Structures are given as C-alpha cells and as structure tokens.
Amino acid sequence: MELKKYEELLISNIKALMSVDSPSGFTHNATELVKKMVTDLGYKCTQNNLGNVVVEVEGEDDTAPLGMSAHLDTLGLMVRSIKPNGDLAFTVVGSPVTPSLDGEYCRIYTREGKVYEGTVISETPAKHVFKDANTHPREAENMVIRLDEVVRSKEDVVKLGIAAGDFVCYDPKTTFTSSGFLKSRFIDDKACAGIFITLLTIFKELGIKPKHKTYLCFSVHEEIGYGGATLPKDMKELLVVDMGCIGDDLNCRETDVSICAKDSSGPYDYDMTTMLVELSKKHNLPYVTDIYPMYSSDAIAAWRAGHDVRCALIGPGVAASHGMERTHIQGLMATVELILHYIQ
C-alpha cells in the first residue's frame, strides 16, 4: 500500500493538535479543533457529555461495528496554592516524569480567561546560592511555578486572578527532524489522534470503505483512567491506538508499530492480537509484540465500565514516555498501514 504521500499531511495534523493545550479536564479547545478538522473533511461527528468526540465512518456492513480510540488529553499541572513569595505550588494532572519538567516554560489559564506565562523550576534552582541545586528532589512538592509577572507576594498573585484549581500547561516543544524523528511531549497520544485525522483523508482520497461501520473515537480522559468508559456501547471490537513502549527488555523501537499482548491490567484479546500480528507479517510491516509493564489504556476503562467488547492495542514506538518523548515517521506510518489492513 503506497502511503508515502500522506507523511507530510500526518506531520501537519500532529503539529496542529500539538499547538493546542489539552491536559485531562481542560480539553475543550482540542475537541473544538478536532470537530472542525473532521467536518472540514466532510464527516459528521458527535460529542458526548464527558467530551469524547466520535466520528462514524460508514462500512459495508453495520451489524458489527468496530471502534478505534486515540486520546486527545495530555498530562499537565494545576495550581495547588500560592506561596507567600508569589511562586505557585502545583499538583500534577496524570503522571508526568516530574524531573523532566525542571526548566519548562508553561502557561497558567485562569477561570476568567486570562493566560499568564511562567517556568517550572526547583525550589533551589540557583547554582550560585544553593548547595543542593543539583541534588534537590524534582517532585511536585519540591518544585514551583515561577510567574513571569512582577509579583512579590501572594496578594500580588491573587490580584492577577490566579487561584487554586487553575490549569497549567507546559510546552510540548514539537520538532520533526530531517531524519524522520518526531520529538515532543504529548506524542502520547496526539500522534495517534493525528493518525485518525489522516485516515479520514485517506478514506476519501483512496475510496476506502471499512468492512464494518467504524467509530473513530477521540477520548479525553485517558490519562486519568476513564477515557474509554463512555465509548459507543454497540462496538463489537475496540482497537486502541496509543503509544508503544520502549525500554528495558522490550522489543520496540521508534521505527516500529508495537502490538501489545498484555499491560499491567492483563492480556488483550487473543484473537484480535493474533490477527494484528498476522496482518503485520503478511504486509511486511516493521512490527513487534511486547508486554507493557506499567500501562493502562482506553480498553481497560471500557472493560471496567462494563463494555462487552473485544479489545486490542497498537501504536508507534515512543521513547521516554511521559517525559521528552520521541517517535519516528516510519513507526507512525506503519501504524497507519496496519489500521488500514485491519478495517478491511
């Protein structure tokens, strides 16, 4: 299947999604963007009460609908309190690798619609002042947000309209290299959401019609555990498209599409997983099968919510997950191709 001409489109779609802040609980701007991108391509979509966006793609048969899920929500931070000197204490949204946040530029969104800039730093950031500047723990309770405003006290910050509960979003720093690497935060899972948007174009331009009615689902609470809980109830199968794990004794690299046999919640559907392996072999895709030791997905949330659905999990290999992540266009396009073979 010749798909190389869609690489630039995929890159463009990923960049567009990365440009919009969307930590779990603060995804409205991202869902509005996705709805516009989808409708501009001529598709209809719906959005449920919790915010998931679902695109229904007509199939040759509508008696056994398939679902595919990628999540729009990302990791983030939230203001916990204002310190006496005007720095902000924060709590994490999801599970970022907090030491990797030291020095990150960020935006603070107030409930009145104001946006302020700042930097995530250690409590002891100055090498010329603090003996433990190098060794001070980099956890949420040992770090602060330094506002880029002239503030000297808690009262100064309150006057700006900043309060506990305000979302804090840090820069993804999205970069595509000439060698094909995507370096960015939030590749998990905006890269796969970008794959879904690209698939909709491929369906149109190549005249591809899925064998079964297919729901493309953009979930918005995956990073906090219940993204898949409110996906369509009539799905017979759910293919979760999320990042593949890299590291330790795992097989995956950034250039692969990873097929997950089991994560920390248990095995995925045996028959679906076997079919995905066989499709990868048949079409000579760069694939691996792996066990993800500390991982959960929209499939687990769907099962725990009582969905009677078979589930499998695939995705491009992503290094340094929940930190400064990296994948490769080869792994991304292999994921695209495996999905296309799966739905047909």
PLM region descriptions:
Residues M1-Q344:
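N-terminal hydrophobic/helix-forming segments and targeting peptides
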